[in-house]
Amino acid sequence: MPIGFWSVILGAMCVISCGEKQKRSFNAFDTYLQFYQEVNDSLSKNPRYVCAEAQKRMTATTDSTTYYHYVMLLAKAYMFRSDMDSAAVCMNQADAYCHRNAPTPQISDLYADIYNMRGNVLARQALVDSAVICFSKALTYRLNGDRKEV
């Protein structure tokens, strides 16, 4: 067989294998988004269920950023359970992850979720001025992220 034929085959295999890595990462986050849409209404009605399901899915994901989106979903469920200490721990874990990573649109989206949650917690504590500052930061991060529609 000619060398050109094998070069084409090898090149095609490289392109396919690189494409799958991107697809796997996308699928992990896509799975999170689908789960989030399914349980969004349950957050206020049945936060214990959301906590249990989010914890199960956290252990199954292989993408770090997706893992911390699950952590933030867990924080929301804790907030609805009025477990503000656990919510704060989750927010701090996600914040530490963001600080360790280079700024990207995905990290900006995660920061937006963190500051939005902090704003919600502060608003529940009647700390309105501090909540407004957090909501403003959340908006700034959201505009730098991929998920502007959220």
Predicted segment positions?
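A "functional boundary" signal
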Residues: 18-150
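Positively charged n-region of N-terminal signal peptides that target proteins for export
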Residues: 1-5
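Bacterial N-terminal signal peptides
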Residues: 6-14
